[in-house]
């Protein structure tokens, strides 16, 4: 289950959204919204209110002359006052 969650995305926009209890993660592209919600609720013992997902399109790299694969990004909204604790 840990392999399905790859890492947290930390950009300027995602750091600003932490104030409104929204966390951004890169996850496995085969997961759907209900599976993502169950995984986060089990791992971090929090209540997930909303799950938004988006897939980045394939892009062509001129340096390596091949396509970069797409990835799936998820934005989670959790209850106010709850934090995701990373160990």
From Swiss-Prot:
GO terms for biological process: translation. It is found in: Plastid, Chloroplast. GO terms for cellular component: chloroplast; ribonucleoprotein complex; ribosome. It holds the Pfam family Ribosomal_L23. GO terms for molecular function: rRNA binding; structural constituent of ribosome. The gene is rpl23. This is Large ribosomal subunit protein uL23c. The keyword Ribonucleoprotein applies. Its main location: plastid.
